[in-house]
Curated annotation (Swiss-Prot):
It catalyses: a plastoquinone + NADH + (n+1) H(+)(in) = a plastoquinol + NAD(+) + n H(+)(out); a plastoquinone + NADPH + (n+1) H(+)(in) = a plastoquinol + NADP(+) + n H(+)(out). This is NAD(P)H-quinone oxidoreductase subunit H. GO terms for molecular function: NAD binding; oxidoreductase activity, acting on NAD(P)H, quinone or similar compound as acceptor; quinone binding. NDH-1 shuttles electrons from an unknown electron donor, via FMN and iron-sulfur (Fe-S) centers, to quinones in the respiratory and/or the photosynthetic chain. The immediate electron acceptor for the enzyme in this species is believed to be plastoquinone. Couples the redox reaction to proton translocation, and thus conserves the redox energy in a proton gradient. Cyanobacterial NDH-1 also plays a role in inorganic carbon-concentration. It comes from Prochlorococcus marinus (strain MIT 9215). GO terms for cellular component: plasma membrane-derived thylakoid membrane. NDH-1 can be composed of about 15 different subunits; different subcomplexes with different compositions have been identified which probably have different functions. The keyword Membrane applies. It is a peripheral membrane protein.
Length: 395
């Protein structure tokens, strides 16, 4: 008796741009053979707003409020990189106190970024409970931002060329330490709930594996790179701001799969807490109320307490600040990886060229490669582990 042969034809399925599990307006054109992915083509550009061209038609002072809308989970990082570029090009010094304040804001943003990644990622793989937990801690970070900058999630407009917009309010450092005391045990709770959960581990272990050489060749950065065994963190490598003053370790894993990327981000939250604690204790001048009391008690106006390192801004830059002739590329480590700015000045108030490097755009490029051979049910887990925000991908 002749045996019937089963033949299958490839089927093309569209994921997004409006999909409940899609992280923004991303469209994936996926070719399937049964339940197996044989090809994937990401389609981006739905959220393109011309941020680079806007930068070239605005003064650098005017442009700072725009950039936090690119990545609403990492607004402080984009504010930092946008002011770092003209600072370095014009050799503008940054007071030590201002640098510490910047580090505090950046590390709080790193924790908020990882929390916003953790909740939806776990919801994607079927764990609903942690999704509600993460907003409890993020709310405390929003309260700290609101007290310091006047704004909660985006458009903080706090970073300035040469420093920050204002000094920390009275009692802010104490509240920040209280948050650290609260949040440390919460990370332990997350780990008890998630890390060794057998269902969670079976769901994502071995998915989306990226080898060390692949991660380097694809120019990955951030947790995507460190989860593949490469201990590369720009806070250590470039030593920008005042990160050399703190004792902390680079979080890395070797497996390169979704589970390793989860472990790296959880450990990064612990390291960020450590940096915040140290910064709160070591900030030049201490809390604002103590610094002002010392200044009032000091009659000698040439005392160190009135020096530049105890100011929150070196010199307020005029709205007509001209970007000097020259070009440079500057970068920093955000929660998603390396973000950078290439700036080219021509002694005008607006830059001649302003190129932004978004970490998640580079990280997203490897998605078709790691999806081949995966099951259709694993697409969202692998995509979620990359951590993309389409505002910064499309710009």
């Amino acid at each position: 008796m002749a045996q019937l042969e089963t033949r299958t034809e490839p089927m093309v399925v569209n994921f997004g741009p409006h999909h409940p599990s899609m992280h923004g307006v991303l469209r994936l054109v996926v070719t399937l053979d049964g339940e197996n992915v044989i090809d994937c083509e990401p389609v981006i550009g739905y959220l393109h707003r011309g941020m680079e061209k806007i930068a070239e038609n605005r003064t650098n002072v005017m442009y700072v409020p725009y950039v936090s809308r690119m990545d609403y989970a990492a607004g402080m990082f984009y504010e930092a990189i946008v002011v770092n570029a003209p600072e370095r090009l014009a050799n503008i010094p940054v007071p030590k106190r201002a640098s510490y304040i910047r580090v505090l804001m950046l590390e709080l943003n790193r924790i908020a970024n990882h929390l916003l990644w953790l909740g939806p990622f776990l919801a994607d793989v079927g764990a609903q409970t942690p999704f509600f937990y993460i907003f409890r801690e993020r709310e405390m970070i929003y309260d700290l931002w609101e007290a310091a900058t006047g704004q909660r999630l985006i458009n903080n407009n706090f970073f300035r060329i040469g420093g920050v917009a204002c000094d920390l309010p009275y009692g802010w450092l104490e509240k920040c330490i209280d948050f650290c005391d609260w949040f440390g045990p919460k990370i332990d709770e997350y780990e008890k709930l998630i890390t060794n959960n057998p269902i969670f581990r079976k769901r994502i272990e071995g998915l989306g594996t990226i080898q060390r050489d692949q991660a380097i060749n694809w120019s990955l950065s951030g947790p995507m790179l460190r989860a593949s065994g490469v201990s590369w963190d720009l806070r250590k490598v470039d030593s920008y701001e005042c990160y050399d003053d703190f004792d902390w370790q680079i979080a890395s894993e070797k497996e390169g799969d979704c589970y390793a990327r989860y472990r790296v981000r959880v450990e990064e939250m612990r390291q960020s807490l450590s940096i915040i604690r140290q910064a709160c204790k070591m900030i030049p001048g201490g809390p604002t109320e103590n610094l002002e009391a010392q200044r009032m008690a000091t009659e000698d106006k040439k005392s160190e307490i009135f020096g530049i390192d105890y100011q929150y801004v070196a010199k307020k830059v005029a709205p007509t600040f001209k970007i000097p002739n020259g070009e440079l590329y500057t970068r920093l480590e955000s929660g998603k990886g390396e973000i950078g700015v290439f700036i080219q000045g021509n002694n005008e108030v607006t830059p001649w060229r302003f190129k932004i490097r978004a970490a998640d755009l580079n990280n997203l490029q490897i998605l078709p490669h790691i999806l081949k051979g995966a099951k259709i049910a694993d697409i969202m887990a692998i995509l979620g582990s990359i951590d993309v925000i389409m505002g910064s991908v499309d710009r």
